[in-house]
Design a protein with these regions (language model features):
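Bacterial N-terminal signal peptides that target proteins for export
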Residues: 2-12
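Bacterial N-terminal signal peptides
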Residues: 11-24
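Extracellular/luminal regions of secreted and cell-surface proteins that mediate adhesion/ECM remodeling
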Residues: 28-286
């Protein structure tokens, strides 16, 4: 477990506690006025080492009122699932600058959409979570939507100078400015305990049952997509005609990471996998 995770849990606990007494506007962290480095091009990857260390197969109980249950089409009740963490480092020579989600919504540029259950904005086409049967090629998908792009931890394998401070730590809210992005040499992380960070294995989300066996977790950040129904194309893929990406990058070919896992027949509530000994508490959306 990385040292930053306990710190993140502590900060998250304070935010959850504050939710009981503070108005929604108070959740917007004060924007840190810092210069953004856009003299170059960002390059997102998926942290394969983190993914390899952060997964678990176990049974959990899903409440009908949970937003991930409603948005992901999951039947309330008990389900075996695979949970996992996803880190998306920026190894490019420039920051990824997103800024304030409210401005993107006002511009109708296709980067964000409003999530009625969570009452905040979600990214569109930020990442693709797939569970792959290596024999048949069948693919299951998770319904997780990206929410807030932040500098959460420095990426130790960054090839350039890694002495810069964080810049992006403000998600913002509806009507409250945010300041989002990923600085070069930093990584955003969606921890395994968060809502939607899982595949449902028993068909409880409407997909086919996942039999016990060996599988591949495949994560794609900033995936290519074909615009539908007048959907904006923010960044055209230079090597694939008609394919677009939400964020600019110097290299779209290094956006995928895969790890092999084994799904047992009866994982139980204690679970099977590298995170077996972790607590069972499930956090919020970020």
């Amino acid at each position: 477990m990385r040292a930053t995770f306990p710190r993140f849990r502590a900060v998250l606990g304070l935010l959850i506690a504050a939710a009981l007494v503070l108005p929604a506007a108070a959740f917007a962290v004060a924007v840190k006025e810092v210069p953004v480095d856009e003299n170059g091009t960002p390059d997102l990857i998926v942290d394969q080492a983190l993914l390899r260390q952060h997964w678990i197969v176990r049974e959990e109980t899903f409440d009908a009122t949970a937003c991930d249950v409603q948005e992901g089409g999951v039947q309330p009740g008990d389900h075996p699932i695979v949970r996992f963490s996803v880190g998306t480092p920026n190894i490019g020579d420039a920051d990824i600058f997103v800024g304030d989600p409210n401005q993107h919504i006002a511009a109708n540029d296709g980067l964000f959409e409003f999530a009625t259950c969570h009452h905040h904005y979600h990214f569109r086409h930020y990442a693709l979570y797939e569970l792959v049967d290596p024999v048949s090629g069948h693919v299951w998908r998770a319904a997780k939507r990206g929410f807030c792009m932040l500098d959460l931890e420095k990426y130790g394998a960054y090839p350039g100078p890694n002495n810069n401070d964080y810049k992006f730590r403000s998600c913002g809210a509806v009507g409250v400015p945010g300041f989002q992005g990923i600085s070069k040499g930093w990584s955003d992380v969606y921890w395994w305990k968060l809502q939607g960070q899982y595949f449902v294995l028993d068909g409880g989300d409407g997909q086919p049952v996942v039999p016990p066996g060996d599988y591949i977790i495949r994560i794609t950040v900033n995936p290519g997509f074909v615009p539908q129904g007048g959907e904006p194309c923010r960044n055209a893929d230079p090597f694939h005609a008609g394919v677009c990406h939400q964020l600019p990058e110097s290299n779209y070919d290094n956006n995928v990471a895969e790890v092999h896992i084994t799904i047992p027949d009866h994982p139980g509530r204690e679970g099977v996998g590298p995170l077996k000994d972790e607590a069972a508490n499930v956090a919020g959306d970020k």
